[in-house]
Amino acid sequence: MNKILKLTFVLFLICAIVAGVLGGVNELTKDRIYAIQNAATIAAYSAVLDAEGYDEVDFDRTAFPVVDKISEATNGAGHVVELTVSGAQGLITLAVGVDTDAKCSGISIIEHSETSGLGANAAADSEIGRNFRAQFVGEGEDIALSKSGGHIDALAGATITSNAVTGAVATAIQAVNSLG
């Protein structure tokens, strides 16, 4: 019995030390991690709508549950909508630019967990990825994949991801239109 108590105490001590070290590392790196994430978001916003700054606006969160944030460009160029939608392998977070004519001005995928070589091509900095994202520019809220009568060609082998991104763009435009 005494041996079990000693082993339990040693295990507890090891766990407490490891937890303390992990907590300390988290405390030391959290500001840097936040800065990197914030820089990536700002870069994504700038890629979809050219503006010097963005001001967050209120919107009906119950009507648009996948919309995380809507920001208005300070130069009046339009809005950037940040959304999180379900893809084939997990969540996809993207920024969608919506110009003053309620058309998509660009999309940028901020974070995803899609299959490499398939759905991940939507975010890839490759010809396939750039061509896929470029299709959305100028499209309105009636956007659809070509197999559904629209103009957007799905990524080969990644129909679920293509549907998710297309739906996100339509939702972003609808959310901006609801602002009035």
Residue spans for each PLM region:
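Flexible, solvent-exposed loop/hinge segments and secondary-structure transition points
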Residues: 2-180
